[in-house]
Amino acid sequence: MTLWFVFALMTVAAIFAVLWPLGRSARAQNQGSEVVVYKDQLTEIERDLASGLIAAPEAEAARVEISRRLLAAAGSEPVSEPKSSLKWRRAAAVLALVGLPLVAIGVYMPLGSPRLQDFPLAQRERGSGSGMAGSLENLVVQVEQHLEKNPTDGRGWNVLAPVLERLGRFDDAVRAYRNSITYNGESPERRSDLGEAISAAAGGVVTAEAKTEFERAHALNADDPKANYFLGLAAEQDGRKDDAATIWRALLAKAPADAPWRPLVQSSLVRVGGGTMPALSDETIAASKDMSEGDRGAMVRGMVERLATRLKQNSDDVEGWLRLVRAYLVMGDRDKAVGASSDARQAVAKDTERLRQLNEGLKTLGLDG
C-alpha cells in the first residue's frame, strides 16, 4: 500500500511540474523583460545627473539613446493574453492533473495484474541458465550452417569440435576433430583430442581406434599429458596395471606441481596400486637379494621412515600419504596406518580436491572411517 502511495505522489509531482507553467500569466513572465531594464536605466541617468556624476550633454545623449531602445523594445513585446485564455489554460491543467491518473488506472486495471507475485530470483537465474544453454546451441547451429557452406574452414572445425564434445555430441565431435586435422594439419593436441572424443563416444573405453590416435599424439610429443594419461588408461583396461602405473609415474615425474590434471593421475595411480611402497633403485633390489629376512625388513622399515619424514615437510603429497598408509598395512602395523591416514586428512583438510582424492584412496585400502 505504501509503495502505491509513493507512486501516486511521484505521478502527481511529475504532472504538476509539467503543467505549472500553463497556469502562469504572461504578465508575470514579462516583469524581467527589456522594457523594465531600460526604464531602470533612465531612472539611473536622472540620479547620476542630479548627483553631478555626469554632465548635462552626456545625460541628454544617453537619455535619447535609451529612450530609442525602450520604444523599440516596447514595440516588440507580446500583447498580454486575455484573462479568458488564462482561465482555459488553468482549467486544462487541473483536468490533466486529475484526469491522467484516472485514465492510467482505468487502462491498467483490465490489462495489468496488481496481485501478481514477484518472479523469484532462483527462477530468474534458472531461466537465465537455460537461456544461455539455448544461446550456445543456437551458436552451434550457426557455425554448423557456416561449415556446410564452407567445409574447408579449418578454424571453424577447430572451434566447433570441443563445444560439441562439451554438449555430449561425441560422434559429431569426432567428425569435427577429423576435419580439423584434415584442414589444419595434425598436432599432438588435435590427435589427443580426437582420441578422447572417440573414447567418450565409446562410454569411456579406450578403443583400438582411440589408442591409435593417442599413440600418434605420443609420437609427435612424448610428453603430451593427455596422450600419456589415456595410454595408461588403455593399459589398465587391458589388465596391465603395472604398465599403467609405470606410465603414470613417469607422467607425474615430469608434471608441474600446479598441473590441473595432476590429481586425476595421482588417483588413477592409487587405483591400480601403483603407490604401494617407495620405489627401489636397481642397486637396492640387487643388494636385497643377499640380505637375510630380518635385514630386508629393516631396510623396508627405514625406507618407510624416510617417507614419513619427507611427508612432514611436503604434507600436501596425497600420493605419498597413500603410499605410507599402504606400507604400514603391508608391514601389519594397522595402528600406524590409521594414524598416518588421520595425519594426512589433517594436512590436506583445506584443499577440497586433494581431500576427496585422499578419502577415495583410503577407501580402497579399507580405511574409509
Swiss-Prot record:
Task of the protein: Required for the biogenesis of c-type cytochromes. Possible subunit of a heme lyase.
Keyword annotations of the record: Cell inner membrane, Cell membrane, Cytochrome c-type biogenesis, Membrane, Transmembrane, Transmembrane helix
Compartment(s) of residence: Cell inner membrane
CC annotations in GO: plasma membrane
Gene expressing this chain: cycH
SMART domains: TPR (SM00028)
Protein name (database record): Cytochrome c-type biogenesis protein CycH
Cited PROSITE patterns: TPR_REGION
Biological processes annotated in GO: cytochrome complex assembly
Keyword check for NADP: no
Coiled coil: none
Segments on the Periplasmic face: 112-369
PANTHER family found in the cross-reference section: CYTOCHROME C-TYPE BIOGENESIS PROTEIN CCMH, CYTOCHROME C-TYPE BIOGENESIS PROTEIN CYCH
InterPro entries the record matches: C-type_cytochrome_biogenesis (IPR051263), Cyt_c_biogenesis_CcmI (IPR017560), TPR-like_helical_dom_sf (IPR011990), TPR_rpt (IPR019734)
Segments passing through the bilayer: 7-23, 91-111
Membrane association type: Multi-pass membrane protein
NCBIfam families associated with the record: cytochro_ccmI (TIGR03142)
